[in-house]
């Protein structure tokens, strides 16, 4: 929501949603201000039951605890947060490099403590760039092996990493881009702790064919994110037929 439009929006309109929508922290800054606690209270006032925060892992423990207290008071549930430092500019999981793998697994272990602190169940994983020096099938094996090790860490805690394919236009060169690819990886990892985050916006740009792909991947999808194309704006503002998708 843009600041210029904020004055036009009534604030006392709690709504009973049919789906468990989770706004991202920061979406309502124009209405609720910059303070995360004020934003959580605003979300609850509007009828939302969940929220997500990609940056939760990097917030101070004090703020995490304060946010958890607010969540409990307002009956809000934590959605996804990003579990690790995403390698936007280098191959990490696809490379098979042992040091890269160990660094990733160390961050997964640390994110368990964050998840416990904020009562989160899902954490986002992006496998980083392709390694253009290796055949894609070897890279896939490297990613699968690393994710299996991550599942060994997560399973005892009942936590789920959701691997997110991202589109080639916004994030050129990434290893994981398509839903069939994510589906095959999850099938190979074969763990309740490795599922798909299906971002409808990204997949519309990357591959389209949204409803058949969702149906084909359904058993491996644990989480959806939404946004319309072009521009990653509100649903119904662009080309995606969200009425049919929902």
Residue positions per predicted region:
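Active-site acidic/histidine proton-transfer and metal-coordination neighborhood
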Residues: 15, 93-195, 205
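Catalytic-core regions built around general acid/base machinery
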Residues: 66-75, 146-154, 213, 244-245
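Distinct, well-ordered alpha-helical segments
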Residues: 32-36, 40, 64-68, 140, ...
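Generic enzyme active-site microenvironment
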Residues: 50-51, 162-163, 197-200
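N-terminal pre-domain/capping segments
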Residues: 1-120, 191, 207, 219, ...
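Active-site clefts of carbohydrate-active enzymes
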Residues: 228-234
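Aromatic- and acid-rich polysaccharide-binding/catalytic face
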Residues: 192-203, 221-225
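Short, glycine/acidic-enriched loop or turn micro-motifs at the edges of active sites
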Residues: 55, 167, 202, 231
